[in-house]
Amino acid sequence: WMKISITVGLVLVLLLSLFIKNKERAIKIGLCLSLCQQFILYSWYIGTGYHLATEGLPLFHCRICMLGLAFAYFAKKEKLVNYFAILGLICGSMACIVVDLDHFVFPHWTNFSYIVGHYLLVFNAFMLVRERSKIQVKDIISITLIMNLFILVADLSLKANYGFLMKLPSSLSFVPLTGVSVGVFISLLMILVLAILNKVLPYNKVLLEDKEEYIKA
């Protein structure tokens, strides 16, 4: 019942975002709440020392999106906002459908944080996706490869599995890959999915720098 309830909550979050009138204010509040949630979560990991190196760092794609969206939005890095909005919507939704809670009796803080954090990510990402600019495939490729290379180096150094770049989740256990090859597979899959969604999802404008490139071409 817990997993079903979380999925139903995901649908309600998406519906709620459709009826908000003051979008800019809602996005700012949502991003600030997301930062607070992340701060409390990392404070808990640091305070308890529970799997700090292998699970407590902001190296999962969802956590990167949570922090990346806030930084990019407030720093007015439009290209990164558009990238993390699409990635955050995908990752956040998947996390609410294929639920992977920590092994603590609910309601433990980590599990509560998991639910709230991903709801906020989906809310923020969905709000921003609807106002997004179209980005170029080369940017999707470069950002994804740089991000995943950094995660993969951390995984190898810490013997962790951030981003599932060393070992696939159980739902993809049928894929005969292990080690670094998993990271390559996930990276290619991410690039493909992000490129497709970037093309098919509606967008309001084109980045100014992209306009200039089109004019020069």
Predicted stretch roles:
Residues 97-142:
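A contiguous pocket-lining binding segment that forms or flanks enzyme active sites
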Residues 34-44, 88-100, 144-156:
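Aromatic-anchored segments of alpha-helical transmembrane domains
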Residues 46-55, 75-79, 100-111:
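Membrane-interface helix caps and helix-loop-helix hairpins in membrane proteins
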Residues 17-29, 74-82, 130-139:
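Membrane-interface helix-boundary motifs at transmembrane edges
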Residues 27-31, 56-59, 81-89, 111:
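Cytoplasmic-side transmembrane-helix entry/capping segments in multi-pass membrane proteins
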Residues 5-15, 63-74, 117-130, 180-199:
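Hydrophobic cores of alpha-helical transmembrane segments in multi-pass inner/ER membrane proteins
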Residues 2-7, 50-62, 83-85:
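Structural signature of hydrophobic alpha-helical transmembrane segments
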Residues 1-8, 137-146, 156-195:
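Membrane-interface transmembrane-helix boundary segments in multi-pass integral membrane proteins
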